[in-house]
Amino acid sequence: MGSDDQSAGDRIQKGFQINYMILRDADSGKIIWQENKDFSAPDQEHEARVPVKILDMRAVSREINFSTIESMENFRLDQKVLFKGRIMEEWFFEMGFVGANTTNTWQSTIEAAPESQMMPAKVLNGNVTIQTSFYDNETLITKSVVRLYYI
């Protein structure tokens, strides 16, 4: 990554903020968890306390509301789910163009792994982190790490 890419990433990151995140049961639309917190701060591990029933759902709808000062040509994210530091799952999401000085809501659906691959909540609790890297094309904007606790 060249210095122009780095300065573009820094510029975008300074004006980028997550306003809230919502997880819903994708089938019923019912809110399971909501947090009005900026999970985009890169130099800290965030925590989320999520109801254990989320593990029994066929699919979860994730809604991210974010604001940006800078425009982005191809906003996308790479999300890794890690168990004790080892990658269990990885997803790639692409939103596309995002205008300058806007607030946007991005909703995507994540389907559950087959039941045979699921681990119980007591094993997962506190051992799962979700590492989300936000990009504009290939330029890294910020990386968020959230540790999950099931309640």
Swiss-Prot record:
Name this polypeptide is given: Probable cGMP 3',5'-cyclic phosphodiesterase subunit delta
Subunit structure comment from the entry: Interacts with Pde6.
A Pfam family of this chain: GMP_PDE_delta
Location in the cell: Nucleus; Cytoplasm
Main location: nucleus
InterPro entries the UniProt entry points to: Ig_E-set (IPR014756), PDED_dom (IPR008015), PDED_dom_sf (IPR037036), Rhodop-sen_GMP-Pdiesterase_dsu (IPR017287)
Family the entry assigns: Belongs to the PDE6D/unc-119 family.
Residues making up the signal peptide according to the UniProt record: none
GO annotation, cellular component aspect: cytoplasm; nucleus
UniProt keyword list: cGMP, Cytoplasm, Nucleus
GO process annotations (BP): sensory perception of light stimulus
